[in-house]
Structure formats: C-alpha cells, structure tokens
Regions:
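Alpha-helical solenoid repeat scaffolds of the TPR/TPR-like class and their adjacent stem/linker regions
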Residues: 1-197
Length: 197
C-alpha cells in the first residue's frame, strides 16, 4: 500500500518519471502496486492497464467465494436491471445517470438501485430515487449480505458504477449475485475482475 501511495503522490506532483528507481524498490515493483485508475494516466498500453487492474483484484478480492447466481435464467416478464453505487447523491455519477434511469422502458425493464450513498437530501438524490422502481440501501450490510440481498431480488443484470474507484465494493460482485455483471462509467478502464462480464 505504501508504494501505491508513493506512486500516487508522484503523479500529483507531476514528478516524472513516476517510476523512478528508489534502490530498494524497483520500477517493476511500483508498476505492480499501481491501481487501475492511476495506470490510466501513466500508460495507454491496454496490457499494462489490465495487469494493474488484475493485480489490485488479486490483492483485494476474496478468493473462492460461493457463486450466488443461478445458471438458468429467471424468466421474469420484465428484465431486472440493478445499479450498484455509493454515488446516488450530489455526485457526477448521478448527474450523468439520472436521465438514463428515467429513460428505461418500463414495459420491458424493472430498475433497481442498490446503494450505500450518503443521505445528502439533494434534489439529485431524490431524482435518482424516484427514477428507480426499487431503491434499496445496503450501507449497513457487509458484502456477503449485500450480495445475498441482490440475489434474493433475482436481478438479471447488475451494473456496477464504481469499478476500482473510491467507495467501491468489488467483493459484492465477487459473489456473482447476478447472472450478468458489468461495470459502467465510474472507471473508464477494465476492472480486471474475473466476476465482471
């Protein structure tokens, strides 16, 4: 973690090259400690970005978690789409997605929001909540409980709006509570998570 923060600070200081040899810590060790988000500004090489994301997921995500989603389709009359985020408040993610939530064709889709966002009382939060057919707070639940709750709602497609950004809860995805899981918007790069389709 210390190396990750050192790389981050050098980026903020515009101290180039970021991966300067420290003697005891090689540039290769620094690259291995770089987050997926930080790698976006350090390299345009897709392989380097994937390696950074996978390194993070290997360090942070529990292994061998039970898969909760069934292999067969649920067969609902409407496809259940759920959005997972801590940014359903006065935040750029909500600014960019509120209309998206509102525009889902309700004759074909049932829209869920699973959140651990702060209750900021903003008009934007109220708009996001109103745009969901079901808005469910999971802030008091641990990752296993949150994943089970998502599974209990028989979500067909789970859309994570974080990726590997601050506030993310990728371990929820690691339980694979939905048959199809994707990420959108929060991190404009790969997550490197094997549980994301």
């Amino acid at each position: 973690a210390t190396i990750h923060h050192w790389v981050f600070i050098r980026q903020k200081m515009c101290a180039w090259p970021v991966y300067a040899d420290l003697g005891a810590v090689s540039p290769e060790q620094m690259k291995a400690a770089t987050s997926a988000l930080a790698m976006l500004s350090l390299s345009d090489d897709p392989q380097a970005q994937l390696a950074a994301a996978q390194s993070y997921s290997m360090r942070k995500i529990p292994k061998s978690l039970p898969v909760l989603a069934p292999k067969a389709r649920y067969g609902h009359s409407k496809l259940r789409i759920a959005y997972l985020s801590s940014d359903f408040c006065l935040h750029p993610v909500s600014m960019l997605t509120a209309e998206l939530f509102e525009l889902h064709d309700r004759s074909k889709f049932e829209v869920y929001g699973f959140c651990w966002s702060p209750e900021d009382g903003s008009a934007l939060r109220k708009r996001v909540m109103a745009a969901m057919d079901q808005f469910i707070r999971i802030g008091a639940l641990n990752d296993a409980e949150a994943a089970q709750l998502i599974r209990d709602h028989e979500i067909d497609i789970l859309i994570d709006l974080h990726g590997q950004t601050r506030g993310a809860r990728p371990a929820i995805l690691a339980y694979r509570p939905a048959p199809v899981q994707i990420t959108y918007l929060g991190l404009p790069a790969t997550t490197g998570l094997p549980c994301v389709d």
